[in-house]
Regions:
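Alpha-helical tetratricopeptide repeat
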Residues: 1-115
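Residues that cap or delimit alpha-helices
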Residues: 23, 56, 194-197, 232-236
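Juxtamembrane/interface motifs at transmembrane-helix termini
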Residues: 75, 108, 186-187, 366-367
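Long, positively charged leader/targeting segments at protein N-termini
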Residues: 87, 116-172, 176-181, 208-564
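Intrinsically disordered, low-complexity polar regions and short flexible loop motifs
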Residues: 184-189, 194, 486
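Carbohydrate-active enzymes and regulators
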Residues: 196-200, 345
Length: 564
């Protein structure tokens, strides 16, 4: 399976390639010429050559009309800043394809972004004025508005190494301690209630100030999203259906149930809380979970919402550092490198699987090497043996499932996964009562072959649960013109989310296929064909060197090959 994670196009070379094809015009029919113009249009789009891309797409469409091209044209006009033309094309597509739910969200997003863009900018200016009055520092940054749900902080000037990117006064930070001073917070303390989440404290501040026109937090609350359409707990059914089979789907449903349980608990136990609706509570909790910082103030660990700082988007290598300056009583973000003017500035939300980014924050990373999937051990599989003797092992629910990423992400975690699989497929009664550590290393060639078959079967069973094939997902995300591939859209995020999981299952199918060959072929054949050497230098080299070579060397064949 080709991974778009590994796809690095040289778009300039591809434009030249398709230009040569078009110019030679080797008696191609209209369908082929349409395809050539379409392909060149895609590469020009990726290069930011939107006018050239538009010209090529028009030629392609004239030769072979296609309704989906209307959305592709809309993408181009959106990039060109022609909102009117963009909406005209999207509405035309919607009229011809009313069943396509996603198109309504595209239209609403563009309409709302246009309507509220100026208003939002004024609100941010008001917030900035308040922060500066309270001794915050924001001279080095400005806000770039991408969509309703996506804004980013960019540099307003050149920023030097170890220079302050921004500083936010403690007076402007919503902290856990302030939450305990709210009316709701005081009642919680008086009644000695145990809250479901520490995030509740700051949620209480938001709720009590939500409708107060004279609140000191007014300018901050005014810029907070009124809706979180990009966060999966608010998704409509059509998006949830796209996530069928995904690990994150159960997390989304669990999150919704958890918030409802929290609300019911607070409503039933606190008089000061009864005035707030479930919708208001979920809004406040979502604000907190999508923006919270864990900070140390005067030596005390606490949590806080920090205006402006909470708009930095995530990057695994942000080249910034944040901390609370106890001397000056400000939250600081400083540079770990020099930044030129007009470049994005990032924070890190930590290394997480896309399912956590998606459920908690409403975004996914195209290139996320921290992705994991859940393996549910299929106890009915033909490879599994002797379950009636393994009841003690089965009594621990954690032994029936395993969260796993690629091998190099966490080698020890992979070895534990293998040990569970080895025990399940083990048919040697003498080993049933052995300690778990026995299975951290291979026990026999036949057992390991059965383990690999078992892993392959589990992967295939998981892949069958998804609502689309991996190839279909890949075709979408590799095509910048595909109607489901609009930047920052929910539909695209769903596709990236599910493809990332399928990629890991496919990763282990390939591992199992290759390693079964290594364990079943003659040793001389492995050497002559370079299968073993290739495996030792490939992406599964840790497993091959740790386990496969250990098994192949039981009679000293590898030692003999290496040292004679």
């Amino acid at each position: 399976m080709l991974s778009f994670l590994e796809s690095d196009y040289n778009d300039i070379e591809w434009v030249e390639y398709y230009t040569n094809k078009i110019d030679t015009n080797e008696c191609y029919d209209s369908g082929k010429m349409s395809e050539l113009y379409y392909e060149r249009a895609k590469h020009n789009y990726r290069l930011g050559e939107y006018l050239k891309s538009n010209t090529d797409l028009e030629k392609s469409h004239q030769l072979l009309p296609n309704d989906d091209n209307l959305v592709s044209f809309a993408f181009i006009y959106e990039k060109l800043g022609n909102t009117k033309k963009c909406l005209e094309l999207l509405n035309k597509y919607k009229k011809a394809n009313p069943e396509e739910e996603f198109i309504k969200d595209y239209i609403n997003d563009i309409v709302n972004f246009g309507c509220y863009d100026d208003i939002s900018k004024k609100k941010f200016e008001a917030l900035k004025d308040w922060l500066i009055i309270e001794n915050s520092f924001l001279d080095n940054i400005k806000i770039k508005f991408n969509t309703n749900d996506n804004r980013e902080i960019i540099s307003q000037k050149d920023i030097g190494l170890n220079e302050s990117i921004l500083e936010i006064s403690l007076k402007c930070m919503m902290t856990t301690e302030l939450g305990k001073e709210t009316e709701i917070g005081k009642e919680v303390i008086d009644k000695n209630l145990s809250l479901y989440s520490k995030h509740n404290w700051i949620s209480f501040i938001l709720l009590e100030n939500l409708h107060k026109s004279d609140s000191i937090w007014r300018t901050y609350i005014d810029i907070l999203p009124k809706k979180f359409d990009n966060v999966p707990i608010f998704f409509k059914k059509n998006y949830l259906n796209m996530l069928k089979g995904c690990t994150c789907l159960s997390k989304i449903l669990s999150k919704i149930a958890s918030l409802q349980t929290e609300y019911k608990f607070l409503f039933n136990n606190l008089e000061t809380f009864k005035k707030y609706s479930l919708a208001e509570y979920i809004w406040a909790r979502t604000v907190v979970i999508t923006r919270i910082y864990g900070v140390v103030i005067d030596g005390i660990k606490t949590q806080a919402l920090v205006p402006f700082a909470d708009m930095l988007n995530h990057n695994n290598n942000p080249e910034t550092q944040w901390f609370f300056d106890d001397i000056n009583k400000v939250f600081k973000i400083v540079s770990k490198k020099k930044f030129n003017v007009n470049v994005p500035i990032y924070d890190s939300y930590g290394k997480k699987c896309n399912s956590r980014f998606f459920v908690n924050y409403g975004f996914v990373l195209d290139r996320n090497m921290e992705n994991t999937v859940r393996f549910n051990f299929d106890l009915k599989s033909t490879e599994v043996s002797g379950l009636k003797y393994k009841k003690t092992f089965l009594s621990n629910s954690s032994n029936k499932t395993h969260i796993l990423g690629e091998i190099e992400q966490n080698r020890n975690n992979f070895n534990i996964f293998l040990a569970k699989a080895r025990y399940y497929v083990c048919n040697d009664e003498d080993l049933f009562d052995e300690s778990f550590s026995t299975f951290l290393v291979p026990i026999s060639i036949q057992n390991e072959i059965n383990v690999l078959k078992y892993i392959m079967r589990m992967c295939i069973n998981h892949i069958r649960k998804y609502s689309s094939s991996a190839k279909n997902d890949l075709d979408i995300v590799l095509n910048p013109f595909h109607k489901y591939n609009r930047e920052y859209s929910n539909v695209r995020n769903c596709i990236i989310m599910r493809y990332g999981e399928k990629f890991i299952y496919d990763y282990y199918i390939k591992m199992a296929t290759m390693c079964i060959k290594l364990l079943t072929r003659d040793f001389e054949d492995l050497i002559e064909t370079n299968l073993l050497l290739d495996a030792l230098s490939g992406k599964y080299h840790l497993y091959v060197s740790d386990s496969i070579c250990d098994l192949l060397n039981t009679d000293g064949k590898i030692d003999k090959y290496l040292f004679e």
